[in-house]
Design a protein with these regions (language model features):
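Generic C-terminal helix-cap and adjacent flexible tail
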Residues: 1, 126-131
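Conserved hydrophobic "DFG−1" position in protein kinase catalytic cores
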Residues: 11-12, 19, 85-87, 103
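Conserved N-terminal beta-strand and adjoining loop/helix that marks the start
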Residues: 1-17, 37
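NUDIX/MutT-family hydrolases
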Residues: 84, 94-125
Length: 131
């Protein structure tokens, strides 16, 4: 089975995390943490900065690795490095690829339909509840 390596940013602000709704592809309308594929020769930290700039036109400060999720979708295996992140000072997000976005508190985190691999991340966030 093909493995796809991706990164995701768990962007925190005012005790909320940022979630995006996919606007394209097989998983259209599913909710996820923003991010994308790691390019050959690229570090995960560099990839997440690049992806957030491409998807949200925003600059972020990458924090600690929260977790790496290994998930088997029907046609591929996903390996997803998930990093805590914050918006850089004076940076604002604009949706360039996603259909919608929300800031979610811990009480609201289960109100969206998360993609399967992101469900694993949500479980860890709820267990740690440290954002």
């Amino acid at each position: 089975m093909k493995t796809i390596r991706v990164v995701a940013a768990i962007i925190r602000k005012d005790n909320k995390i940022f979630a995006t709704q996919r606007g394209y592809g097989d998983f259209k309308d599913g909710w996820e943490f923003p991010g994308g594929k790691i390019e050959e020769g690229e570090s995960p930290e560099h990839a997440i900065v690049r992806e957030i700039k491409e998807e949200l036109n925003a600059d972020i400060i990458v924090g600690d690795l929260l977790t790496t999720v290994e998930y088997d979708y029907p046609n591929f295996h996903l390996s997803m490095d998930c990093f805590w992140a914050e918006l850089a000072p004076d940076s604002h997000m604009k949706l360039l690829e996603h259909e919608a976005a929300k800031w979610l508190s811990i009480d609201e985190i289960d109100t969206v339909d998360w993609l399967p691999a992101d469900v694993e991340v949500v479980k860890i966030i709820k267990e740690r509840h440290n954002y």
